[in-house]
UniProtKB/Swiss-Prot annotation:
Stretches of the chain forming a coiled coil according to its record: none
Record organism: Brucella abortus (strain 2308)
Superkingdom, taxonomy of origin: Bacteria
Identification of the protein by name: Large ribosomal subunit protein bL9
Role: Binds to the 23S rRNA.
Gene3D superfamilies the record matches: Ribosomal protein L9, C-terminal domain, Ribosomal protein L9, N-terminal domain
Residue pairs linked by disulfide bridges in the UniProt entry: none
GO (cellular component) term, any one: ribosome
Swiss-Prot/TrEMBL keywords: Ribonucleoprotein, Ribosomal protein, RNA-binding, rRNA-binding
Amino acid sequence: MEVILLERIGRLGQMGDTVKVKDGYARNFLLPQGKALRANEANKKKFEGQRAQLEAQNLERKNEAQAVADKLNGESFIVVRSAGETGQLYGSVSTRDIAEIITANGFTLHRNQVELNHPIKTIGLHEVSVSLHPEVQVKVMVNIARSTEEAERQAKGEDLTSIEAIYGIEEQPLSEEVFDDEDEAEDQA
């Protein structure tokens, strides 16, 4: 199905472009969300008549998104989750979790604006991209930890998945004596 885009859509086109998309994508997403019109003569004339107004609305939304981006860019958010000793989470942190944390801190954000290739499954500092507008993207830091104290330690740069951090002992390489003792025990057996 051919549609006329009413706003910029990533990997598809700019406002005013006539593009061919799959019928389901147009019917279930683009048309109901008001992001496109069916490409017929009546809609083309309607779009050309409203083009200046649509461009002004798009510029206004972009400026609002840029104002939020200036506040949000580089911010760090703490997510507390249960995890094993090695740093593997019991579960994962998804786009919904990140959007809820950011929203709880006073920003308006939907989960589809958080760009995450796959759920986060380990503790640590993770950089996440947030798309506030098709032309405005920011990076935020998500600090996933077992507790707020641990999150503060991670923020300072401490590695909490090392043996020293887990057990409180220094990680030391095995000396050759250990291997020699094992070899002697095997020879005697």
